[in-house]
């Protein structure tokens, strides 16, 4: 994984999520992984405050990269082919076991990325639409409470809420996107977020159809 922050540019994320979707509405996992790598570089560029999320995302991306380079890689070309393959071959733990048989299944791994993507999508949209003096801690907490908080323990939720208090200003966030100006960053977010949202919506629908949204 390339964790260099200096190469981050919002345009790279936009291109990755654009290329993620085929004309048939399939989600191509190589581009999905590439888009997430860009988002991780963005989070890491802001310091340790997001490390609790970025470290977990990096671990999940590594699992997906191993699946993409495995002998079964053809089944992991798209989200749709992965779900069809793992569900039909019973490679997904559908019930809560003390010792899951498939803790690193693609479906379970992408579900964790899917949930984190929803949080980041809502937070970035909050940055895009908020005023210059908006409190990023509030924006981030609201996005977190609507998404990831539903899957975290009370202790984790409290620790995360405290960590968000150390977030930099909206201006710093926008400057970290490495555009020519904060105005251009806002404009680019407006172009990128619909693609991210579309990928999220397609994934959500697919997982719901196969009863995969509550995988342990």
From Swiss-Prot:
First-listed, main subcellular location of the protein, grouped into a coarse class: cytoplasm
Pfam families to which the protein is assigned, alphabetical: GLTP
Residues binding an N-acylsphingoid base 1-phosphate, per UniProt: 56, 60, 108, 112, 152
Keyword Nucleus found: yes
Source organism, top-level taxon: Eukaryota
GO MF annotation list: ceramide 1-phosphate binding; ceramide 1-phosphate transfer activity; phospholipid binding
Topological type in the membrane: Peripheral membrane protein
Protein location: Cytoplasm, Cytosol; Golgi apparatus, trans-Golgi network membrane; Cell membrane; Endosome membrane
Listed GO CC annotations: cytosol; endosome membrane; Golgi apparatus; nuclear outer membrane; plasma membrane
Signal peptide: none
The UniProt record lists the keyword Nucleotide-binding: no
Catalytic activity: N-(hexadecanoyl)-sphing-4-enine-1-phosphate(in) = N-(hexadecanoyl)-sphing-4-enine-1-phosphate(out); N-(9Z-octadecenoyl)-sphing-4-enine-1-phosphate(in) = N-(9Z-octadecenoyl)-sphing-4-enine-1-phosphate(out)
Gene Ontology terms describing biological process: ceramide 1-phosphate transport; negative regulation of autophagy; negative regulation of interleukin-1 beta production; negative regulation of NLRP3 inflammasome complex assembly
Keyword annotations of the record: Cell membrane, Cytoplasm, Endosome, Golgi apparatus, Lipid transport, Lipid-binding, Membrane, Nucleus, Transport
Gene3D superfamilies: Glycolipid transfer protein
Protein family (similarity comment): Belongs to the GLTP family.
Protein purpose: Mediates the intracellular transfer of ceramide-1-phosphate (C1P) between organelle membranes and the cell membrane. Required for normal structure of the Golgi stacks. Can bind phosphoceramides with a variety of aliphatic chains, but has a preference for lipids with saturated C16:0 or monounsaturated C18:1 aliphatic chains, and is inefficient with phosphoceramides containing lignoceryl (C24:0). Plays a role in the regulation of the cellular levels of ceramide-1-phosphate, and thereby contributes to the regulation of phospholipase PLA2G4A activity and the release of arachidonic acid.
Protein name per Swiss-Prot or TrEMBL: Ceramide-1-phosphate transfer protein
Organism: Mus musculus
């Amino acid at each position: 994984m390339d964790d260099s922050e200096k190469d981050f540019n919002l345009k790279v994320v936009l291109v990755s999520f654009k290329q993620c979707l085929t004309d048939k509405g399939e989600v191509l996992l190589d581009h999905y992984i590439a888009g997430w790598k860009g988002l991780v570089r963005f989070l890491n560029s802001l310091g340790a405050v997001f490390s609790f999320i970025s470290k977990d995302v990096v671990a999940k991306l590594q699992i997906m990269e191993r699946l993409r380079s495995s002998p079964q890689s053809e089944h992991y070309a798209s989200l749709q082919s992965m779900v069809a393959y793992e569900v039909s071959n019973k490679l997904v733990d559908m019930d809560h076991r003390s010792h899951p048989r498939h803790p690193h299944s693609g479906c379970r791994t992408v579900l964790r990325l899917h949930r984190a993507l929803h949080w980041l999508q809502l937070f970035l949209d909050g940055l895009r639409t908020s005023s210059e003096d908006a409190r990023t801690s509030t924006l981030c907490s609201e996005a977190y409470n609507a998404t990831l908080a539903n899957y975290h323990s009370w202790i984790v939720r409290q620790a995360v809420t405290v960590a968000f208090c150390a977030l930099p200003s909206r201006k710093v966030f926008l400057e970290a996107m490495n555009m020519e100006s904060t105005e251009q960053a806002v404009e680019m977010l407006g172009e990128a977020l619909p693609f991210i949202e579309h990928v999220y919506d397609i994934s959500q629908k697919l997982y719901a159809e196969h009863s995969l949204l509550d995988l342990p």
